[in-house]
A protein has these predicted regions:
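Non-catalytic terminal/linker segments enriched in charged/polar, low-complexity residues
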Residues: 1-123, 130-136, 158
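P-loop/Walker A NTP-binding module and the surrounding RecA-like catalytic core of P-loop NTPases
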Residues: 81, 111-333
Length: 333
């Protein structure tokens, strides 16, 4: 049963709900959670491993203990702002005698971090009945953008959607080739032009083809590096505008792909792209290879942007819908 491309309002409404990336219940469970905990082991060690050692044998919450806690949170890549807010919350609870036992610090932080991660969906436009959901995927080179698009296409395909991949990163021939390989692997339609072509023209032609072929989901790969930051943002802005002219409301969603291993740089990238394009969703890749997974907390808290997917490995099924409760449980329990 298809999710997108519905011909009546009620079906289109349910399509929007289903587009949030939730997978069938049978695909969730103990096996995935165990793998999630394994892949987040470095992040867990960075945060709760050091926290456990800090509070071991402590009888009270002192100023020195809070200073050490602040260092643990900051060096776990939660960011200056998020770390300070967490410390302020703990200090307030201590001052009010609501928190006395160092052993309760962990549960306090767990509860507050879960609150930070629970970000409501950003405003997003809904495709009209019979029109495809158009997703523009952005991010700097090297974050795993093209691979993420291929894996996301597989998720959409698994739910019966007709998917089209669009090679609008025309500045790198390798990106076009890589996306074409992914399209064949997952069974998606593919639109490209020659290297160096106008990315906006590629997107315009792709949306025309998507309408005629009754495509349900269009995923657009974009450039990640031009001569200057301004050139890149101008180019992406043009792609955005052309998509909207061809299909009013498009792109309906704009996903930003970030590399978790870059730590605090990911927050500055998110701010830059969000100011220029209005990001609806964050996708965080390479969480399995880093102790900097705390960056998820900083991004959600500072930018109030929801995390849509996380990448925890190289396999096609390792791009998973983000679940804040599972993430916090994997780190703290």
């Amino acid at each position: 049963m298809k999710i997108f491309g519905s011909k009546n309002k009620s079906e289109a409404e349910s399509a929007t709900l289903d587009s949030q990336g939730q997978e069938p219940e049978q695909e969730k469970g103990k096996g995935f959670f165990k793998r999630l905990k394994e892949r987040l082991a470095k992040t867990k060690s960075s945060i709760t491993g050091r926290l456990d050692r800090l509070i071991l044998g402590k009888k009270e919450i002192t100023g020195d203990l809070l200073d050490e806690l602040e260092e643990i949170l900051f060096t776990s890549d939660l960011g200056v702002e998020t770390t300070q807010v967490l410390i302020d919350i703990v200090q307030d609870k201590v001052a009010r005698k609501a928190l006395k036992d160092p052993a309760k610090l962990k549960s306090t932080l767990k509860e507050q971090i879960l609150d930070f991660l629970t970000v409501p969906p950003a405003d997003r436009r809904t495709p009209a009945p019979g029109e495809p959901l158009v997703v523009m995927v952005v991010g700097v080179n090297g974050v795993g953008k093209t691979t993420t698009i291929g894996k996301a296409a597989a998720l959409f395909k698994s739910k019966g959607n007709r998917v089209m991949l669009v090679a609008a990163d025309t500045f790198r021939a390798a990106a076009i080739e890589q996306l074409e390989i992914w399209s064949k692997r997952v069974g998606a339609e593919f639109i490209k032009q020659k290297p160096g072509a106008d990315p906006s023209a590629v997107v315009y032609d792709a949306l025309e083809a998507a309408l005629s072929r009754e495509i349900d989901v269009v995923l657009i790969d974009t450039a990640g590096r031009l001569h200057t930051k301004k050139n890149l943002m101008d180019e992406l802005g043009k792609v955005n505008r052309v998509a909207g002219k061809k299909l009013p409301g498009a792109p309906h969603e704009t996903w930003l792909v970030l590399d978790a291993t870059t730590g605090q740089n990911a927050i500055s990238q998110a701010q830059m792209f969000n100011e220029a394009l209005g990001i609806t969703d964050i996708i965080l890749t390479k969480l399995d290879g880093t102790a900097k997974g705390g960056i998820v907390v900083g991004i959600c808290h500072q930018l109030k942007l929801p995390v849509r997917y996380i990448g925890i490995g190289e396999k096609i099924e390792d791009l998973r819908p983000f679940d804040a409760e599972e993430f916090v449980q994997a780190i703290f329990d």
